[in-house]
Structures are given as C-alpha cells and as structure tokens.
C-alpha cells in the first residue's frame, strides 16, 4: 500500500500541453510536411537556440513494376509504398536559422534503413544529403545511428529484410531549450537501493486527443469517467535515520518544499520535465546528479505508449507523488525471462 500526495494544478498547467501534429495531404495525396516546436524553460525568442530534434515519418519500399527492363525505368521516378511509421532522434545542437529552413533540410534528407538484430531488434539509419541548416547535427548524421527497434518503429516486424527501405521525413518535432538543459537521472542512481528509505515516485496522468485502444495502449477511467493514460517515473529516495520512522506528513512536507514544476517536451516523442524551484536536501540533490531540472523521455519510460501518442495532442491532467518503501537490496532484478544457471540453462 502506498501513500499519495497530489500536486496542485498550477505546478503543471502552464507548460503541460502539447498540440497535435496536423495531418494534411496535398494534391499528390502525400502528407504535407510540418514542424512543431515547443519551449522548455525560458529559451531566447530570437537568435541562437539549442534545439533537440526528432524526425517523424514513414518507412517505404520501392513498388514492384511490371515493365522491368523498359526505357521508362530510366525516365520515370521510383514509386514507393509505405511499410511502417517511425522516428529518428538526432539530439541537441545550437541552431541559428528559421524553422522553415530546418523543416526543408530535414525533408530533403536521403535516409536508408536496415533492420537488424543484436541482443534485441535494432534499426540502422544511414543519412545522405545533409543541408546547411543541419550542419550542427552533421556529426551524428554522417556517422550513422542505431536504435532499439521497439523505440523508434511502431511495427518493426513490418519492415522487410530482403528489400531496400528508405525513411521519408514528414514531420519534425523540436524542443527549444532555455536555462533548463536536458539532464537524465543516471541509471545507477535511479536503481539505487538504500535501507530504511522511502522511494518517491511520480505518477503522471495524461489526456490525449486520439483513441489508443486499437494500438494496444489501454486507458483507465478517472472519477469522472474520462479515459486517461498514466506512467510512473522515479524521482529519488528519502532516507530515514536508523530507528526513526518518518511519517507520511514528513515526506509530503519534503516534497512541498521542493516546489516542483512540471512540463511536457518533445524529446524522443513526448518527454516529461521536472524542475526544482524550491529547497532540496543534499541527499536528494545527489540522487538527481546535482541537477535542478531533469528530463524523462517517454521513449525510455514507456516506448510503446510513446509511439502511439507522439503525434497527438497530449495534456497533463494530474501529477501525484507516490511514497513507497524502497525495494530491498536483497531483491534480485531479472531482466531476462530465462533464468540463468538453472537445470540445463547455462549462461554463455
């Protein structure tokens, strides 16, 4: 059983909404490119910006033609059929130009894709035709990038392995960063287990503008009967002194003194940002890697939910602090469903 503290609405109402990507088609029945920029923190209104970019689009394969070997093969452009949708995160860089220049440079990219496997299924991106607006990101684009397939492709099983695949960019998600930089809690700190401690987790409730059931993301009904989605992130631990039991009221007062502000960004699709504007203990600060602003990309927290809602309207409708006993150190984490060194199963 856990105790819950509900944050007041003003802590997330200012920047807790993301507008949807408009899906409009032109005369050729193709989606019209669009760039969506959202601000996190207090970025400058003009001039140089730090932008985190996520390219959204479709995986396509060449259509099979019946007139192979004819002269028209050399004169007519190759037509493609869509085999899936996905994204390409290219990270943060300092950008000087306009949004429309950036959009055109992104849609002009020639991106080839390969589906492969390591410990899990992966998507390999190889990029050509990098225009001038994208030069700040060119170091990553030229090297090629590999991502977990379940994080960047809605249905990786639909990508053929025996055909050429291209990734056609249609939409660009940008997060303009101000004083708040992108800082993630290191995994070693997020997995930290301390005796006699209380784990502070955040339960984030969202409302989206699309129906998610058919894509495998089941909503829950709130007290008013509205469909909502939710996910949890770990913020840190409140350490109790030996022999002393901290009350729920004490934990709530510690959280209230932090004066947390929440917002949504577009890093990796949808991202949840936490900013500390109040007082923070040294113990808690060390668990946040000495940062007063941290980012939780939904791509890492709940990849499938992120894939389903990253183009939709998203709004924070509630944030709760959940106080739970910290998981004991002697509990073992099993990342694999196959138990090692049991019977005939041996670790290689």
Swiss-Prot record:
Pfam families, per the entry: Matrix_Paramyxo_C, Matrix_Paramyxo_N
GO cellular component: host cell cytoplasm; host cell plasma membrane; membrane; virion component
Impact after mutating residue 113 to E: Not incorporated in virions. 50% loss of in vitro membrane association
PTM comment: A large portion is phosphorylated in the cytoplasm, but not in virion. However, this phosphorylation is not essential for virus replication.
Keywords: Host cell membrane, Host cytoplasm, Host membrane, Host-virus interaction, Membrane, Phosphoprotein, Viral budding, Viral budding via the host ESCRT complexes, Viral matrix protein, Viral release from host cell, Virion
Membership in a protein family: Belongs to the morbillivirus/respirovirus/rubulavirus M protein family.
Quaternary structure annotation from Swiss-Prot or TrEMBL: Homomultimer. Binds to the cytoplasmic regions of F and HN proteins. Interacts with nucleocapsid. Interacts with human alpha-tubulin and beta-tubulin. Interacts with host ANP32B.
Listed name of the protein: Matrix protein
Naturally occurring in which organism (per UniProt): Sendai virus (strain Harris) (SeV)
